[in-house]
Amino acid sequence: MRLARRSSQHGIALIIVMISIFVLTMLAAGFAYSMKVETMLARHASNETALQWLGRSGVEYCRWILVLQATCPAEPYDSLNQAWAGGSGGPCSTNGPLAELEQEVHLGQGSFTWKITDLDAKANINTAGEGMLEKALMLMGVDAADMTPIVNSILDWIDPDDQTRIEGTESDYYERQRPPYQAKNGPIDDISELLFIKGVTPYLYWGPASSNSPPNPLLEKLNPFGSRDRTPNYQVGLVDLFTPISSGKININTASAEVLQLIPGVDQIIAEAIVAGRQGEFDPTGLTGPYRTVAEVRRIPEVNMLVQRQIEQFCDVRSRAFRVEINAKIGASSRTFYAIVVRPTPRETQVVNFYWKY
């Protein structure tokens, strides 16, 4: 009996020891994991400032590129075949600083890649009138019965008064929504503001980009307007046609055929002919390649005198507003920065906005 009791006590002691070892092992593993997480957080936190300065350096690099391009006398235009847009480049890119541009720039312990997008390749939503908005909806394939409410709701959102247009929408309607809000009654600052406007659904905003997946539930909550029992198949989205920041003139060297069709008198055939006409290598005679002046569009057989006058009124060959995207990286840490850069004169650029997304 005494031996059995001792054996039982030894067994209990062994179990207690094993449990203690297991608990201590789990505590040690948890502590090691938490220390690893804290170390990673500390490393990322220490890189935050450096990443931001890398992003700002990338923006300055792009400003330098834009000034170099604008001050090149051999290329009095902005086009997609130039180095700033990722193209092979024209005469100014064969030698000099533009010929030595690096897509990935190494700076200190980090690096950044850059991308410049021409905002003047789209129409300005704040200056687009009723006719241009209607033409955009026709191009997208919106039902004729829905055009007037959407167009007038957009114009009511932008205009400074509270007078409701025919089938339009002002604050008295938006204040009854959940959550309630008011009409902007001012210029659109971000193109995504369109999603707050009655009639502008995520499908209408994104176009084909929204057809492969259901819309963001938050966007549908913010914009409950329109039918949800069917998925519209729009040819293009409002985000592809308009921008809130631009000079107000469309660059015929960078605009898509869809954007060019927003110009009065320009149909699909003319727009595609204009796009095709700007292709090819630089030609100092102006017969092929990018348009050096808007008047050179007359070399396109499909463009008659009346259409040329409309193009000269709405278009330019110089761009003055750009969106810069910088991807900064230090070790395993990375951050994407964005900036809106305007170029009022060939030798002057200004950063209107600098931001990043988590």
Predicted feature descriptions by range:
Residues 2-358:
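Compositionally biased linear targeting/interaction segments
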